[in-house]
Amino acid sequence: MANVTMRQMLEAGVHFGHQARYWNPKMAPYIFGKRNNIHIINLEETLPLYMEATNYLGRLAANKGTVLFVGTKRAAQEPVREEAGRCGMPYVNSRWLGGMLTNFQTVRRSIKRLHDLEAMIQDGSLDRLKKREALTVRRDRDKLENNLGGIKNMTHLPDALFVIDVEHERIAVDEAAKLGIPVVAVVDTNSDPRKADYIIPGNDDAIRAIRLYLRGIADGIIDGRTTAAAASASKASKDEFVEMEEASEEETLTESLSEKSASTDASVT
């Protein structure tokens, strides 16, 4: 489980919302007050919701679920790539292509094209093309890598989305809603919390805050997988012990019956 404290949230600026005039009234339960016309988010509300979201994604990962990280705004791009990569999850950090979820079959064809182009580059096939043709292939590969590189190993729709800024990523959030895919999201004071199934009320602009969310979520996913793997190994070991014990008992019984049979034969003789 992610070990994040309220002090760490304060230091990262999680409590700073948007200007009061841009607020969404639906966020009122999570707002502590105003300072210099900036809404201050109540971290006593944020911390438990953050832990709930982290635990949910950890349980999902423990059951071999896939979490798609989404953060295409400039401050989120690098942290999303780093933390999604660290916990082995797919991500979108450049641009959300319309239909990335709702038209996933078409996206998969583009992903296959990306893999084919990468194979051409790696096996030397590109060297047999004319210079202009080779340049076109590389440009196509680079474009596909930029748009789809984070999901090129995602073979099926994700089981959940983790989103930085529901307002900025509204297309992704809407697509997930249409498909019934749960959304875990950082929701600032200018956004509608009803768009996410698990909300984390907090600053969605500051890079330190974004890194804190992502690091904790990634840790939760890694912990979930580790715990599940340990439980699976323990069960396998226990099953093996039971099988050995049963085999030993069966062998003992067989020997006992053999001895009894031999004793009976001797008595008859």
Swiss-Prot record:
Ranges of compositional bias, category Acidic residues: 242-253
GO biological process: translation
Stretches of the chain forming a coiled coil according to its record: none
Ribonucleoprotein recorded as keyword: yes
Signal peptide: none
Family statement drawn from the similarity comment of this UniProt entry: Belongs to the universal ribosomal protein uS2 family.
This protein's name: Small ribosomal subunit protein uS2
Organism: Nitrosococcus oceani (strain ATCC 19707 / BCRC 17464 / JCM 30415 / NCIMB 11848 / C-107)
Taxonomic lineage from the root: Bacteria, Pseudomonadati, Pseudomonadota, Gammaproteobacteria, Chromatiales
Gene name per UniProt: rpsB
